[in-house]
Each structure stands twice: as C-alpha cells, then as structure tokens.
C-alpha cells in the first residue's frame, strides 16, 4: 500500500507528515513485536526529531520493544550529545526514554552475521556482465533480536555510491 503525497512548491507541514506516518504505520502488523528502526546519522538532513517522536507516539504503545540503529556508513560513531540532537530527545546510556539507540559499529567485525552469498552468476546477470564474483551478504547481527525492521531515511545523490 502506497501512502503519501508531495509538492513541488512547498514542504509538508508537520501535521501532513504525521497523517502520512499514521496511515502508513497503522497497517503494519507489529503489535506485540520487537521493532528495530534503522535511521540515518547526522550527515543526512531530514526532520528526524519529528519522525522519531511520531514513531514513539504511534508505535511504542503497540510493540514490546522499539529501538533504533543509526546507519553510520563508514562515519564515526555518534556521541550521546550528537544522538540527542539527532533524535530530539536526551540519549543517556544509549537510551532515549525506553528505546535503545545504537550506533552501527561498521569497524568491528564482530558486529556482523553472514546471511549467505549472492552467487557470481546472479551478480553477472544483475550487472549485465560488468561484475561476476560472489558477493557475501553480511548484516548487523543486532537485527536478529527483532521481529520487524523498518528503514527510515531520505534518499540523496552520493558522490561515491550514486545514491544513499
């Protein structure tokens, strides 16, 4: 189900953003589940304090856990002061209220769990023959502790990877 709207001449109001999130989140089957939301770090611009507050208001009453993983890419971990600014609420000892806020530790091999390999033949097909090697699929092992993952963030052109 697609939910949303946009304008060429103005931003969404906070009320419009809240209504869109309400409509999108109410259909998710997350009641009683553990939910991890992957959010961008401080290098991506978006109204994260607004969005964080709406996730807390709209999902926290329905779930047994609502936590956040900051997608750092290869950036440095964010301090609690930086995390507090990012989410618009105090983050103390890795928590904002009842929610945990985790930095993705891309620089620590123990962070990852291997989920498999995309075979070279499939990579070759996807890339039109430009690349033909196995690609390991490794994700933050934290995701294994949750029933539902949500990815939240803007999409921007990126000077290295095309889009981020």
Task: Annotate each PLM feature.
Residues 34-45, 67-73, 149-153:
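Short glycine-rich or small-residue beta-strand-to-loop segments that form or flank ligand, phosphate
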Residues 21-36, 62, 142-145:
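Glycine-rich phosphate/diphosphate-binding loops that line cofactor/substrate pockets in enzymes
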Residues 48, 159-164:
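Glycine/threonine-rich flexible loop motifs
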Residues 78-161:
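An acidic, phosphate/nucleotide-engaging active-site surface
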Residues 45-66:
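Histidine-anchored nucleotide/phosphate-binding helix
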Residues 1-18:
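N-terminal amphipathic/basic leader segments beginning at the initiator methionine
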Residues 20-23, 50-55, 131-143:
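Short alpha-helical segments and helix-capping/turn motifs at coil-helix boundaries
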Residues 15, 54-61, 147-148, 162-163:
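Hydrophobic alpha/beta core scaffold segments
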């Amino acid at each position: 189900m697609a939910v949303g709207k946009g304008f060429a001449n103005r931003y969404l109001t906070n009320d419009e953003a809240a209504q869109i999130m309400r409509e999108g989140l109410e259909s998710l089957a997350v009641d009683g589940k553990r939910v991890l939301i992957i959010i961008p770090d401080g290098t991506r611009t978006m109204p994260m304090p607004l969005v964080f507050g709406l996730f807390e208001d709209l999902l926290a009453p329905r779930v047994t856990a609502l936590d956040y993983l900051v997608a750092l890419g290869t950036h440095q971990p964010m301090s609690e002061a930086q995390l507090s600014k990012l989410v618009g609420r105090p983050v103390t000892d890795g928590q904002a209220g009842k929610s945990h806020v985790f930095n993705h530790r891309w620089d620590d091999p123990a962070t990852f769990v291997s989920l498999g390999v995309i075979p070279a033949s499939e990579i070759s097909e996807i890339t039109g023959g430009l690349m033909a090697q196995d690609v390991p699929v490794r994700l933050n092992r934290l995701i294994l502790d949750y029933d539902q993952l949500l990815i939240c963030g803007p999409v921007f052109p990126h000077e290295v990877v095309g889009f981020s």
